[in-house]
């Protein structure tokens, strides 16, 4: 959540939020996808997408500039051939995009962060490692009611701003 908020606030510098939590449970009905959607405040719900297509037709680069949270729902549907593209997308901080009916490319900041869900535990099969994904087991039904978005995002923003103050303070000996 901290990385997501930093991404939205444009506080990522040369590196984007390149880590995605993946909610996993072998049992269906734990509300993993519902929880992912509930992370977005109602006013920003149109910036949530749970149908990421890793193809030219899906325009994933454009989605990074236009959406706030991309849910890789049923993460195991992405094959090993798509992982290099996904890893590349996850580390992009700026995007060169040519919007519809335009001839010139524009450099746009990346806004979107990633999250995912799966009903399988054997989904990370990359022999070179999977440092971009953190699997979190949903052991019980996730309570998605009464998410206090104002409080959550105010706290995340305060933590980010506080970290900036600590970074910019001169070292005292």
Each PLM stretch: what is its role?
Residues 138-164:
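C-terminal, non-catalytic macromolecule-binding modules
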Residues 125-142:
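A short helix-turn-beta junction within AAA+ P-loop NTPase domains corresponding to the substrate/partner-engaging
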Residues 119-123:
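Short, polar loop motifs at secondary-structure junctions
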Residues 165-173:
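Residue-level detector of conserved catalytic or cofactor/ligand-binding positions
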Residues 68-90, 124-129:
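Conserved AAA+/SF3 P-loop NTPase catalytic/coupling segment centered on the Walker-B
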Residues 1-65:
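P-loop NTPase catalytic core of nucleic-acid-dependent motor ATPases
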């Amino acid at each position: 959540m901290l990385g997501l908020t930093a991404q939205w606030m444009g506080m990522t510098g040369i590196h984007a939020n390149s880590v995605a939590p993946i909610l996993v449970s072998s049992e269906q009905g734990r509300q993993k996808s519902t929880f992912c959607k509930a992370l977005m405040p109602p006013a920003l719900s149109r910036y949530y997408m749970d149908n990421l297509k890793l193809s030219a037709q899906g325009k994933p680069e454009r989605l990074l500039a236009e959406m706030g949270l991309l849910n890789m729902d049923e993460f195991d549907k992405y094959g090993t051939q798509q992982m290099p593209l996904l890893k590349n997308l996850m580390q992009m901080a700026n995007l060169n995009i040519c919007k519809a009916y335009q001839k010139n490319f524009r450099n746009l900041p990346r806004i979107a962060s990633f999250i995912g869900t799966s009903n399988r535990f054997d989904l990370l099969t990359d022999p070179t490692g999977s440092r971009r994904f953190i699997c979190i087991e949903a052991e019980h039904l996730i309570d998605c009611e009464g998410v206090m978005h104002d409080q959550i995002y105010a706290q995340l923003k305060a933590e980010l701003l506080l970290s900036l103050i600590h970074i910019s303070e001169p070292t005292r000996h």
